[in-house]
């Protein structure tokens, strides 16, 4: 899979831009604040209809314009697939093969991407919400039904929280409704939990040998999905019963606080090196090796799930890695994955992958191919 071309209209600082790309490595070179990251963000938006930088759609639209628009030609399984995404003040519209998609969940998955940006180095050390967003993004593009389930979960969670808030304020409401909402909540929660736990298991299978190699055989990586339920066995019905029992035991606490205290929105993923929790005890080098291992594992996992390698976006991350990790990253993708790199300079990075890359110079919203 690769992105053959992209067209941007009124997106960020690009009023009218058309680019054609190499199916191997493309480097966007330029000083800071010139628009390099905006280009990678456009590719990410074209793939996922979401950004790694903001959730406010207005941020994408050029000042005093009505809408931003992205078009791309994706080559997958030997076929060219046109993608279109328009962003207005009222929301997004998406097309695949020039056909309007009723839901964004039907659009996502036509272009698979893995992004590695400086903020991804906090995937290991950062707040649990960062890891939950990571799971939602990665599972969602491989299994679009996951996005539908996630949307349903968020809808029921919001309803349940509103009801708990009314109970907290001692308003007159039907006492049976909480039990009905809890049952609905548990059904969707276990669906998400199962998909996340399965993903983490597969991710570890790829990430562990990569981490072992990068650490020169000194470290063993384990990844655990820390769920609100006890993940004994593979029976979702048992998980659901455990969740319902837990929710019954904390019902009064939830009413007192007016919020749902358990579920996938409170779950986390934990990383262990040689049995030690990396979040709490890992060095900065170990945290970066773990993040790099996870990102490289994503590439192989998406290939396993979809039959094609994703597009890799490296947003100013090479400067955050030492020479050894740089070399391992570039060596792992060489000749295998279409890659987009943003950087202020390639000097000091001695690797054939960049030497053979197609280079674009970015300055004040203009892009010139070398």
Swiss-Prot record:
MF annotations from Gene Ontology: ATP binding; single-stranded DNA binding
Q: Which GO terms describe its biological process?
A: DNA replication; DNA synthesis involved in DNA repair; double-strand break repair; SOS response
The primary gene name is: recF
Q: What is its main location?
A: cytoplasm
Which UniProt keywords are given for this protein, alphabetically ordered? ATP-binding, Cytoplasm, DNA damage, DNA repair, DNA replication, DNA-binding, Nucleotide-binding, SOS response
Q: Which CDD domains match?
A: ABC_RecF
Q: Name one GO cellular component term.
A: cytoplasm
Family per similarity comment: Belongs to the RecF family.
- Species whose genome carries this gene: Listeria welshimeri serovar 6b (strain ATCC 35897 / DSM 20650 / CCUG 15529 / CIP 8149 / NCTC 11857 / SLCC 5334 / V8)
UniProt-recorded name of the protein: DNA replication and repair protein RecF
Please indicate which superkingdom the organism of origin belongs to.
Answer: Bacteria
Its function, per the record, reads: The RecF protein is involved in DNA metabolism; it is required for DNA replication and normal SOS inducibility. RecF binds preferentially to single-stranded, linear DNA. It also seems to bind ATP.
Chain sites annotated for binding ATP: 30-37
Database matches in HAMAP family = RecF (MF_00365)
Q: Where in the cell is it found?
A: Cytoplasm
């Amino acid at each position: 899979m690769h992105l053959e071309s992209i067209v941007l209209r009124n997106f960020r600082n690009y009023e009218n831009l058309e680019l054609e790309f190499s199916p191997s490595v493309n480097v966007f070179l330029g000083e800071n604040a010139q628009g390099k990251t905006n280009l990678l963000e456009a590719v990410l938006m074209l793939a996922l209809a979401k950004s790694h930088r903001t959730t406010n759609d207005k941020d994408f639209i050029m000042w005093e314009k009505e809408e931003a628009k992205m078009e791309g030609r994706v080559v997958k399984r030997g076929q060219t697939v046109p993608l279109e995404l328009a962003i207005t003040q009222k929301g997004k519209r998406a097309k695949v093969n020039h056909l309007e998609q009723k839901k964004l969940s039907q659009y996502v998955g036509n272009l698979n991407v893995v992004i590695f940006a400086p903020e991804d180095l906090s995937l290991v050390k950062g707040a649990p919400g960062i890891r939950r967003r990571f799971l939602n993004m990665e599972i969602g593009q491989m299994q679009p039904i996951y996005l539908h389930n996630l949307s349903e979960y968020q809808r029921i969670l919001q309803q349940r929280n509103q009801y708990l808030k009314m109970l907290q304020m001692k308003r007159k409401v039907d006492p049976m409704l909480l039990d009905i909402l809890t049952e609905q909540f548990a059904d969707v929660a276990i669906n998400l939990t199962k998909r996340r736990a399965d993903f983490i298991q597969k991710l570890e299978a790829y990430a562990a040998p990569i981490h072992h190699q990068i650490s020169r055989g000194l470290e063993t990586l384990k990844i655990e999905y820390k769920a609100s339920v006890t993940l004994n066995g593979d029976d979702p019905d048992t998980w659901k019963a455990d969740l319902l029992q837990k929710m019954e035991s904390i019902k009064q606490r939830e009413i007192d606080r007016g919020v749902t205290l358990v579920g996938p929105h409170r779950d986390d993923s934990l990383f262990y090196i040689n049995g030690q929790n990396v979040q709490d005890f890992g060095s900065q080098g170990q945290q970066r090796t773990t993040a790099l291992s996870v990102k490289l594992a994503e590439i192989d996992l998406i290939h396993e799930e979809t039959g094609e390698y994703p597009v890799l976006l490296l947003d100013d991350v090479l400067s955050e890695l030492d020479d050894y990790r740089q070399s391992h990253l570039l060596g792992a993708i060489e000749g295998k994955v279409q890659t987009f790199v943003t950087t202020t300079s390639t000097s000091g990075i001695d690797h054939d992958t960049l030497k053979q890359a197609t280079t674009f110079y970015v300055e004040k919203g203009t892009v010139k191919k070398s």
